[in-house]
């Protein structure tokens, strides 16, 4: 009998609410602190940076938050996204495991990022904001918020981490096509950028530094400009839960329940998007689903960092955030998974990790790109370098099931496609790709610098 390959929902089955996991967490995340007073930040203090309704969502403890119809209308351009059985990959591995993936690469920008870009642009538009600033690593977020900002007639300035700016010129052109201005970070447009270039004229940049530049620029024009962020914060991961909510329904359609749910990890948005609705099943129904975050060995905040208060950016413009961190001055190696080159984890994910409710693994770069090639050859989609981390972890788990002779059901999130990341694949296929892993001394040096913050 022919097995179903794709499990698709109708637009009427699309989620109409976002799921806020804070309502179900046994231990709530610690509050962000004002770096001067060391007291919890207030809505008023955050309002110079973020739109007011986004701040309300950031601080909310309500389990569900309605998705505005205007946002749902744009979501329907690409949502619901397919759930796919990776039968080709299963056959290639010779595994008894059943492998499913949620295909977020079908969005206009090619990744999961528009799930939060659209509501962020919408709430800023509602508030009368005319200009937005943001950072981007690999460019998936920058392209997504450019798409969303153009839809609502908002100007956008993007600071793109220099190593990715150089590696991925076509994603920069996507931003330009949607009307955004994009510059390499560090830049000469801000004090933060100029200071970084003075310290190191050849600085390849980091997400933390790009955030500093974007926040600094937003603070110059509080009357009509705000900052928006593509990961880490509570309201961002909230918006991404449309992924997992759809996947819960689709797995039921497939008459399957995952033993484990896997997502790559940079700041937490796609991991939370796929994982949090399944954690809800653990909390509410007593399930034992493993939820696994997979980060690069070159930027291992969950597996080798420490849980501390730290800045979300290099210059210290953000509140102090409770997070697993490598230290905001940590300079990641120039891995191709630019979207995962962030020093810290969001406060919700960090608290879940601290409480042992999720797991974390780190993956070497060469293994992840090898997994990406195998996936492309067996399932047809060239995955983004970020997504290959989830694929590599899935392959490890599937081969482990084969060795043990047990049937496991694995779900991972394909967070984006890699058709504009082909330089990474060129390097891999040429045998020129290298693994990077910071030394204990490097990590200890930047973590020790946090002692004075609290």
Where do the language-model regions lie?
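Active-site nucleophile and cofactor-binding loops and adjacent substrate-binding regions
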Residues: 103-114, 132-141, 233, 262-267, ...
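Active-site/ligand-binding loops adjacent to catalytic centers
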Residues: 64-66, 190, 196-235, 243, ...
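Claisen-condensing/thiolase-fold acyl-transfer catalytic domains that form or cleave C-C bonds
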Residues: 265-269, 273, 365-431
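Active-site-proximal loop->helix
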Residues: 141-204, 301-311, 422-430
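A short, small-residue-rich loop immediately preceding and capping a beta-strand
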Residues: 116, 124-163, 257-271, 291, ...
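Alpha-helix C-terminal capping segments
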Residues: 119-129, 143-155, 176-177, 275-285, ...
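Positively charged, low-complexity intrinsically disordered leader regions
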Residues: 3-129
């Amino acid at each position: 009998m022919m097995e179903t390959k794709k499990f698709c929902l109708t637009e009427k089955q699309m989620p109409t609410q976002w799921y806020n996991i804070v309502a179900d967490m046994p231990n709530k995340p610690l509050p962000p602190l004002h770096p001067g007073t060391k007291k919890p930040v207030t809505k008023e203090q955050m309002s110079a940076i973020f739109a007011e309704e986004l701040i309300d969502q950031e601080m909310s403890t309500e389990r569900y938050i309605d998705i505005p119809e205007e946002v749902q209308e744009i979501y329907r351009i690409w949502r619901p996204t397919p759930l796919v059985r990776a039968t080709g990959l299963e056959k290639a591995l010779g595994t008894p495991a059943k492998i499913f993936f949620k295909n977020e690469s079908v969005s206009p920008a090619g990744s999961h990022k528009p799930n939060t870009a659209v509501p962020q642009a919408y709430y800023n538009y509602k508030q009368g904001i005319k200009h937005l600033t943001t950072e981007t690593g690999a460019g998936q977020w920058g392209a997504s918020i450019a798409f969303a900002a153009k839809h609502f007639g908002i100007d956008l300035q993007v600071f793109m981490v220099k190593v990715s700016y150089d590696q991925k010129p076509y994603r920069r052109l996507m931003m330009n096509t949607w009307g955004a201005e994009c510059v390499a970070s560090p830049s000469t447009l801000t004090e933060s950028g100029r200071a970084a270039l003075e310290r190191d004229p050849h600085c390849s940049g980091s997400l933390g530094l790009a955030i500093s530049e974007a926040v600094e620029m937003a603070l110059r024009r509080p009357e009509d400009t705000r900052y928006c962020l593509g990961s880490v914060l509570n309201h961002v991961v909230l918006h991404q839960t449309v992924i997992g909510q759809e996947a819960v329904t689709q797995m039921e359609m497939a008459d399957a329940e995952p033993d484990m749910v896997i997502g790559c990890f940079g700041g937490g948005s796609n991991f939370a998007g796929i994982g949090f609705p399944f954690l809800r099943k653990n909390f509410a129904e007593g399930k034992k689903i493993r939820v696994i975050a997979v980060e690069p060995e070159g930027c291992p905040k969950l597996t080798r960092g420490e849980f501390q208060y730290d800045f979300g950016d290099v210059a210290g413009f953000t509140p102090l955030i409770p997070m697993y961190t490598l230290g905001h001055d940590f300079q990641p190696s120039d891995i191709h998974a630019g979207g995962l080159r962030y020093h810290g984890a969001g406060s919700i994910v960090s608290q879940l990790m601290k409480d042992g409710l999720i797991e974390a693994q780190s993956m070497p770069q060469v293994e992840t790109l090898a997994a990406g090639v195998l996936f492309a050859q067996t399932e047809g989609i060239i995955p983004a370098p970020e997504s290959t981390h989830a694929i590599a972890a899935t392959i490890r788990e599937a081969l482990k099931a084969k060795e043990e002779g047990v049937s496991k059901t694995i779900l991972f999130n394909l967070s984006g496609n890699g058709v504009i990341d082909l330089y990474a694949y060129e390097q891999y296929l040429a045998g020129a790709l290298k693994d990077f892993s910071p030394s204990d001394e490097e990590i200890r040096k930047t973590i020790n610098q946090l002692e004075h913050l609290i």
